[in-house]
Amino acid sequence: MARSIWKGPFVDGYLIKKVQKLMKSGKSEMIKTWSRRSTILPIFVGFTFSVHNGNKFIPVYINEEMVGRKLGEFAPTRTFHGHGADKKVKRK
């Protein structure tokens, strides 16, 4: 179910503070975060976030198409190694 519009998007407060601090300084550092649940805001465009996937940090560069989605959508938590091979001998 989608979030109510009257509530607005959820973003951890420290992420907004970090982005504003980087905007003032003019630096282009990676912002390290565990907050996969935070919504991407328009002020995040152009920044690179290191999003934790449970094992390591995945670099995610934010562009305009990502606005409104969650940070966790771009850092997959599971790796697919393929299905097991068929061990039965096929007869002709």
Curated annotation (Swiss-Prot):
Q: What is the lineage of its organism?
A: Bacteria, Pseudomonadati, Pseudomonadota, Alphaproteobacteria, Rickettsiales
What's this chain's function? Protein S19 forms a complex with S13 that binds strongly to the 16S ribosomal RNA.
Question: What is the source species?
Answer: Rickettsia prowazekii (strain Madrid E)
One GO molecular-function annotation for this sequence? rRNA binding
Keywords associated with the record:
Ribonucleoprotein, Ribosomal protein, RNA-binding, rRNA-binding
List, alphabetically, the HAMAP family matched. Answer: Ribosomal_uS19
Similarity annotation: Belongs to the universal ribosomal protein uS19 family.
Q: What is this protein called?
A: Small ribosomal subunit protein uS19
**Any one Gene Ontology BP term:** translation
